[in-house]
Amino acid sequence: MSPRAGLNRAVVVDAAAALADEARLEDLSLGDLASRLGVRKPSLYNHVAGIGDLKRELSLVGLRELGRSLSRAAAGKAGDEGLLALAEAYRSFVKDRPGLYEATVRSYRLSDPDDPELGAAEREALEPVLAVLASCGVSGEEEAIHAARGLRSIAHGFATLEEAGGFGIALDPDESFRKLVRAFADGLRSGERRA
């Protein structure tokens, strides 16, 4: 195979993201990626240092994409409306980009925990969540992080159960999700009263 014209790091990462979304991040291999791109595996090393570097880049791309999605969802919204918009955006990201999402969950396990680019991307994804939580009366960074973890856990857990076929009873999962987010919002309000 001759070198493919137009092949660069961004093209390699985009193809890897598509492969990860089709299968699983864990199953992503440089051999499969090379086949997808129509190049020999050694050609990939002109663009990525190896599978670890590629997965780190997928974490970065995924965090940035998730952050943009959360920012769009939260724009102009506050309170319960903002919480639901964020949770739905998160749930949609899990469904639409499963491999890329998996890379965001594993971001710090895949590379250096002090990686400044990954840290900045995580912070950017967190900003719209913190803004909406502040509109719900959550104050102080520590409390906001606890609440953000709670909201993320709700969206992650629901979406992964849903994707695995875990909701077999004939009830609308969208309504279940809305009720769950409303219960979380109610909990935030009751926690505020106790503080």
Please provide the spans of the model-predicted regions.
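Basic, helix-initiating cap at the start of DNA-binding domains
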Residues: 1-32, 36, 53-56
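Short hydrophobic clusters on alpha-helical segments that form packing/core surfaces
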Residues: 12-20, 62, 66, 90, ...
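Alpha-helical DNA-contacting segments of helix-turn-helix folds
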Residues: 20, 54-62, 104, 118-121, ...
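Short hydrophobic/aromatic patch on the recognition helix
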Residues: 38-48
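Hydrophobic alpha-helical connector segments
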Residues: 71-100, 122-124, 144-151
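Amphipathic alpha-helical segments used for helix-helix packing
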Residues: 95-113, 160-168
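Amphipathic alpha-helical packing segments from all-alpha helical-bundle domains
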Residues: 111-138, 145-150, 174-186
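Amphipathic C-terminal alpha-helical segment
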Residues: 153-170, 184-194
